Amino acid sequence: MSRTIVALILLGLAALAAADHHEGHGAEKEWAGKAWLGKWVSTDRSENWDAFVEALGLPLAAYGGNHKTVHKLWKEGDHYHHQIIIADKSYKQDIQFKLGEEGRTAHNGTEVTFKYTEVGDNLQNEVKIPSKNKTISDSYVVKGDELEKTYKINDVVAKRWYKKHAHEPSTA
């Protein structure tokens, strides 16, 4: 009986190792080719952020202020990733998308749809929140090593600025 258990454990470990090996050698992350690809870390500079949070109907105590935010954008195979990290809020979300195609995800339990497009060298994203009957338009404009993200909901426009940082080396 113990040989059977040992064999099952070894088989399970081999399967896990094979799965890990396969994931690590899929399509490699591409960080170049589009101006907006890369790792972007927020600066202390923002404009009209609290008004934007209020227009969304979110509590300022939780979402107001200038929390350090990291946006990582990369291409992997035929799709892109947009990973958003807010460390002091223990928040991390990875959105996979194809340019021009609508996708779905949840943000803190609320269903949202999104559609990323490219206009010239700039990335655009339209986020719809059906339960709140709200639409957010995001624009990502790169100027040198700085990314200016503009958020718009109704007549409220907010901006935050990000600096480009070195991305992690690919694990593939």
Curated annotation (Swiss-Prot):
SAHS-c3, as annotated region: 115-164
Induction of the gene: Expression is highly induced during desiccation.
GO molecular function: lipid binding
Keywords annotated in UniProt: Glycoprotein, Secreted, Signal, Stress response
Region (SAHS-c1): 30-59
Deletion consequences: Affects slightly survival under dry conditions but does not affect survival under frozen conditions.
Subcellular location: Secreted
Keyword Signal: yes
Annotated region described as SAHS-c2, given as residue ranges: 74-102
A GO-annotated cellular component: extracellular region
Signal peptide range in chain numbering: 1-19
Annotated glycosylation sites: 108, 133
Chief subcellular location: secreted
Record function comment: Secreted heat soluble protein acting as a molecular shield in water-deficient condition. Tardigrade-specific intrinsically disordered proteins (TDPs) are essential for desiccation tolerance by forming non-crystalline amorphous solids upon desiccation, and this vitrified state mirrors their protective capabilities.
Domain commentary: SAHS-c1, SAHS-c2 and SAHS-c3 are 3 highly conserved regions within the SAHS protein family.
Other information: Trehalose, a disaccharide essential for several organisms to survive drying, is detected at low levels or not at all in some tardigrade species, indicating that tardigrades possess potentially novel mechanisms for surviving desiccation involving tardigrade-specific intrinsically disordered proteins (TDPs).
Sequence similarity: Belongs to the Secretory-abundant heat soluble protein (SAHS) family.
Protein's name in the database: Secretory-abundant heat soluble protein 64681
Species of provenance: Hypsibius exemplaris (Freshwater tardigrade)
